UniProtKB/Swiss-Prot annotation:
Reaction(s) this enzyme catalyzes, per UniProt: L-tyrosyl-[protein] + ATP = O-phospho-L-tyrosyl-[protein] + ADP + H(+)
GO terms (BP aspect): alveolar secondary septum development; cell migration; cholesterol homeostasis; fibroblast growth factor receptor signaling pathway; glucose homeostasis; lung development; negative regulation of fibroblast growth factor production; negative regulation of gene expression
Sites bearing Phosphoserine, chain numbering: 571
Protein name: Fibroblast growth factor receptor 4
Gene name linked to the record: Fgfr4
Species lineage: Eukaryota, Metazoa, Chordata, Craniata, Vertebrata
The protein's role, per its UniProt record: Tyrosine-protein kinase that acts as a cell-surface receptor for fibroblast growth factors and plays a role in the regulation of cell proliferation, differentiation and migration, and in regulation of lipid metabolism, bile acid biosynthesis, glucose uptake, vitamin D metabolism and phosphate homeostasis. Required for normal down-regulation of the expression of CYP7A1, the rate-limiting enzyme in bile acid synthesis, in response to FGF19. Phosphorylates PLCG1 and FRS2. Ligand binding leads to the activation of several signaling cascades.
Keyword Transmembrane found: yes
Binding site for ATP: 471-479, 501
Amino acid sequence: MWLLLALLSIFQETPAFSLEASEEMEQEPCPAPISEQQEQVLTVALGQPVRLCCGRTERGRHWYKEGSRLASAGRVRGWRGRLEIASFLPEDAGRYLCLARGSMTVVHNLTLIMDDSLPSINNEDPKTLSSSSSGHSYLQQAPYWTHPQRMEKKLHAVPAGNTVKFRCPAAGNPMPTIHWLKNGQAFHGENRIGGIRLRHQHWSLVMESVVPSDRGTYTCLVENSLGSIRYSYLLDVLERSPHRPILQAGLPANTTAVVGSNVELLCKVYSDAQPHIQWLKHIVINGSSFGADGFPYVQVLKTTDINSSEVEVLYLRNVSAEDAGEYTCLAGNSIGLSYQSAWLTVLPAEEEDLAWTTATSEARYTDIILYVSGSLALVLLLLLAGVYHRQAIHGHHSRQPVTVQKLSRFPLARQFSLESRSSGKSSLSLVRGVRLSSSGPPLLTGLVSLDLPLDPLWEFPRDRLVLGKPLGEGCFGQVVRAEALGMDSSRPDQTSTVAVKMLKDNASDKDLADLISEMEMMKLIGRHKNIINLLGVCTQEGPLYVIVEYAAKGNLREFLRARRPPGPDLSPDGPRSSEGPLSFPALVSCAYQVARGMQYLESRKCIHRDLAARNVLVTEDDVMKIADFGLARGVHHIDYYKKTSNGRLPVKWMAPEALFDRVYTHQSDVWSFGILLWEIFTLGGSPYPGIPVEELFSLLREGHRMERPPNCPSELYGLMRECWHAAPSQRPTFKQLVEALDKVLLAVSEEYLDLRLTFGPYSPNNGDASSTCSSSDSVFSHDPLPLEPSPFPFPEAQTT
């Protein structure tokens, strides 16, 4: 009999439930009650798990409650000499005895009571098992998970730039401590750009603005004197890659409506970059759906606003027969465009019942139709191929209602107004387009004309443009000075000096697409005093010209260096300006204007990604204008070690998250603005002079920043340091920068600081990367973060 009971006991030893949240949550030996044989009272909190051993020898011991032996399975169980309660409830209170098998000797005699004064274990306060003055002994517990159900998500896959939070809520008595490991090594975040936040009271680890280098296994280790438990999370950071908008398949969908009803067409757009969305309706002009060049006529029904959330839905109220036809959702960003189409069928009201009956009848014969259509599929395909070939020869355009029609004929859309013969004006907007080949010849050698659609809002007559001397050039493009007659419509006989961007003869299709993309981006962004504005385009009967504002005084770096005061350590690269040195308010004004331009670009959801003094142009009236904000830069193909044509290293203007992980945001532009501030107050100095690139990387990771330039007030240096905070979220916004610089402008006057004084021993003319940095001439401040509080109204940088 005893043998049979022993065998049954062995088979029943498998737990019916587990106190662990995963296989990685280690089970430690359970504690024994404090005393043996003597009666003991333990106070337990509601919801707390209980695990007690019956003496030093667990074999041959059984637990009883109120005289009844506990089963070896269930929420409350006694097995292998252990008393286990998964979650303590009021009905679990009472007297428990541990008896030795055979002799029935009382090994333990204890009473469990629930103390309502104790916080529930559901409370996230880890001090659940604090001491009490009631005289009762509180249950000593090895660490345990209080909310294992919240820890079930092991894999966290998030886009770069997001915030990640790992939680391991636990409790125990004595109160356990928590430590974090990354890939098996102690993790304190000291080498992570932006640092980490450890919230021990919430058992959590928080990392802001994650980057691909944050990938790995993160383990929480919770321990006290009675044991330890651990749990691991896997973090995968998905690197953002620039791409054109993605449209959800099947949307917009074909729709059938009745005259007088309302219709909604939905277009779901996914895009990292701010998309520009248009709803288009295909229309007929003079009996034709297509122009002479084969491109469709399209009416623009709805266009996105910068803050619009309703543009993805096209609402058609009280539809009529004229509303029937093909509708297209067109979405574009700085990378490219995507579009999908659907058909709207409008039925007369009296045909509604007939249509329903017909649809029901058709559904009954669906199977028959499928079989028949399958047998005729080959014949139909041959017929369609013949019809298509005939249409291609004769230029006949036939339209068929399909669920999604990919209109490859107008990937680049332009809007213009159709002039009516009767009134001279029309509210009807048309879009026509051109296809850029991605499979044709790689070069546009000998290009003399480009078949781009006419855009009367921006088209400028080519014969009124006289090209002059080159202002700058790259491998495949160039900028020339030009004279434009009648650019100002109010003064048609006046000539204006402009700058014209164009392609060289050896430009590729990709270069052409980039120039068109820049042109479209400038159209979408609009006008502002502190950016280079688009004035017009030449797209007809010749090469593509993009006409922009002309800046007579060149870029800001040259402007600053030409106005350096005389001295042994400051000398201009070229001829010294006759206008003399700049005053301190003039320098602050330069920074203020650039900040205003960047604030506007930020409001238009435009990330510059290459903000530097060389990309800020200066007009004849000393107005700062940000340039090259519409360029489509391939950030995944940047050679970070390659110098630019003028010898400067782009990496020196890049934020750490952009430099190391290629994450570009408005806050990475703020970092670059801080470098630009440094350029301004060194009068065009080269950042990090004498610092090799390899050393620069490690210095930035360690938190080192450039020291204060000579004659730069501590307030403005504090502003630079705020821009250089390691955590992107802790940097100021451009709106805050504009407000801070505006206050400085109001406070200063011409007598505040005269830069005609000779500068200190620092020379910004040092080499960029050829020499090494010694301790005596280092431009780095070796304190990782500001030593004094920021005078500006945004969060102060904190040491990480």
